[in-house]
Amino acid sequence: MKQVHFFILWFFVLNLYSIKAQAGCRTPNGENARCVPINNCKILYDSVLTSDPEVIRFLRASQCGYNGQPLVCCGSSASYQPPPTSASIRNRRPELLPNDCGYQVEADKILNGDDTVPEEFPWTAMIGYKNSSNFEQFACGGSLINNRYIVTAAHCVAGRVLRVVGALNKVRLGEWNTATDPDCYGAVRVCVPDKPIDLGIEETIQHPDYVDGSKDRYHDIALIRLNRQVEFTNYIRPVCLPQPNEEVQVGQRLTVVGWGRTETGQYSTIKQKLAVPVVHAEQCAKTFGAAGVRVRSSQLCAGGEKAKDSCGGDSGGPLLAERANQQFFLEGLVSFGATCGTEGWPGIYTKVGKYRDWIEGNIRP
């Protein structure tokens, strides 16, 4: 503890003025916050012993006074976080995102372990690719947000996936079991009356600040405009988007959905669901920092439980929070992680709420 106090005094130039604790302030990232003693700000206090020069610079820039001990402007981050680029406010079209979103038809929820039933998560999309030999496969996921747009990861529409897997070919909605037609389930073999639909891709819009090949995968988000409007059914419905200022809580269990690899290493034919806990941002940053990856506030960490995580085929797929009235919100997009299901290593998700303005500014009727 004495060592920590020494470093605190070493970090900060002790200004000759005093400021009232709990006064309003603005962090180096421009976030409105409160000026508090350093030991009352866990996110900054825990980073005092860092050797990262940028974090040290951020700590010093966070000092907002001195009142017996350094006071700091205590926000949500301990490092500089360039805000996501958003479209001009005048171009935003929030009315194109439906209010009737995030609902699913009530059904028996569990068939076998993490299997879903056909009515669950009806916004889940499969993104298909075709290579030069006309071989087709689904390699990414996405989520329907209105009758014309899918939101997915930028790495699913650009870069390596196009070189290795093939060109973007189609989007499938309303799928449940890729091995059966029609989809039937249960002891009495209840069959889904609607077939899945395949739609063409009119346009893809990746975030302008996404850098292909970056190990940090900042701004890993993209939109796919379908070639026609979608009619909503019990098996095809849009998900809700969170507001930019809405945050999930550490320990809160969210649901990741997709057809990715199971614990056997095989891709599932049935749409899967898995509950994963939200991990503290600073703990996640420390874990991945050891591997040279810097996690930002525009990213969300969840998982880290042994043999429980999203895997390769789920890239771009949804991480969901269930709120009041059983309404689901798209909190994250599967971006990347360590080896699938490795204990202590959570998955990294693009935090969708941080990009709502960008989404609203890039969709059209």
Swiss-Prot record:
Catalytic residues in the record: 155 (charge relay system), 220 (charge relay system), 315 (charge relay system)
Signal peptide per UniProt: 1-23
Pfam families, alphabetized: CLIP, Trypsin
Disulphide-bridged cysteine pairs: 25-73, 35-64, 41-74, 101-240, 140-156, 184-191, 284-301, 311-340
Known EC number: 3.4.21.-
SMART domains membership: CLIP (SM00680), Tryp_SPc (SM00020)
Annotated CDD domains: Tryp_SPc
Domain Peptidase S1 residue range list: 110-364
SUPFAM superfamilies: Trypsin-like serine proteases
GO biological process: innate immune response; proteolysis
PTM annotation: Cleaved following the recognition of pathogen-derived products, probably by a lysyl endopeptidase.
Similarity-based family: Belongs to the peptidase S1 family. CLIP subfamily.
Its job: Serine endopeptidase which, by cleaving prophenoloxidase PPO1 and PPO2, is required for the activation of the prophenoloxidase cascade probably following the recognition of pathogen-derived products.
Protein name: Phenoloxidase-activating factor 1
Organism: Holotrichia diomphalia
Gene that produces this protein: PPAF1
